[in-house]
Amino acid sequence: MGVEGTMEYISDLLKKRKRKKKKQMQTVALRVARIDCEGCERKIKHVLSGVKGVKSVDVDVKLQKVTVTGYIDPKKVLEAAKSTKKKVELWPYVPYTMVANPYISQAYDKKAPPNMVRKVPDTASVNETTVDDSYTIMFSDENPNSCAIM
């Protein structure tokens, strides 16, 4: 095993070493219930700014929305926010222009901010519009004597 063998061994070790992937810059929006005073706002800001990778924390008291930006994992941000003993969930609203059918019942929410609707999967609209064929065939205008209720 000469110099070439040693060089190949070292190059194989360097290739096999796993490199950590850099996290993408993300924005996580949270809905935090009962942000009533400046103390609550300060507490949430302090806890979330302590999460590793956080660049900025914005709190909107009126909408009860917290926006966290940075190289972060949304699950870790959610866990840290829950440590404040407040009810926390991911921001459930999107602009109504981003939803395929914003007027279905699952998307409608009275508490939603203006021009926002609740996030719903695309399959929800299909479930509402499907009609059972047996009901449409039951009363046929082509044959009035074929009433299927009897």
From Swiss-Prot:
A metal cation binds at residues 37, 40. Disulfide bonds: none annotated. Keywords: Lipoprotein, Metal-binding, Methylation, Prenylation. SUPFAM superfamilies: HMA, heavy metal-associated domain. GO terms for molecular function: metal ion binding. The modification Cysteine methyl ester is found at residue 147. Residues 26-89 form the HMA domain. Residues 148-150 form a propeptide. The keyword Metal-binding applies. A lipid is attached at residue 147 (S-farnesyl cysteine). PROSITE patterns: HMA_1, HMA_2. Interacts with ZHD11/HB29. Belongs to the HIPP family. Heavy-metal-binding protein. This is Heavy metal-associated isoprenylated plant protein 24. The gene is HIPP24.
